[in-house]
Amino acid sequence: MKKFRWVALVVVVLACLLLWAQVFNMMCDQDVQFFSGICALNQFIPW
């Protein structure tokens, strides 16, 4: 049962990362000033 909990935790974390990546891409598309530096870094991270 403990193993299932770990799997669920990993799935939730991955889902959050994917959601975060999509929000990031939306912000970058809108060219938000605050995100401009982060967007430059974001290009190097293979989502």
Curated annotation (Swiss-Prot):
PhoP-regulated transcription is redox-sensitive, being activated when the periplasm becomes more reducing. MgrB acts between DsbA/DsbB and PhoP/PhoQ in this pathway. Represses PhoP/PhoQ signaling, possibly by binding to the periplasmic domain of PhoQ, altering its activity and that of downstream effector PhoP. GO terms for biological process: negative regulation of phosphorelay signal transduction system. This is PhoP/PhoQ regulator MgrB. The chain crosses the membrane at residues 6-26. It holds the Pfam family MgrB. It comes from the Bacteria. Its main location: membrane. Coiled coil: none annotated. Keywords: Cell inner membrane, Cell membrane, Membrane, Transmembrane, Transmembrane helix. It comes from Escherichia coli O45:K1 (strain S88 / ExPEC). InterPro entries: MgrB. One of its GO terms (cellular component) is plasma membrane. It is a single-pass membrane protein. NCBIfam families: PRK10299.1. The keyword S-adenosyl-L-methionine does not apply. The keyword Transmembrane applies. Belongs to the MgrB family. It is found in: Cell inner membrane. May form homooligomers. Probably interacts with the periplasmic domain of PhoQ.
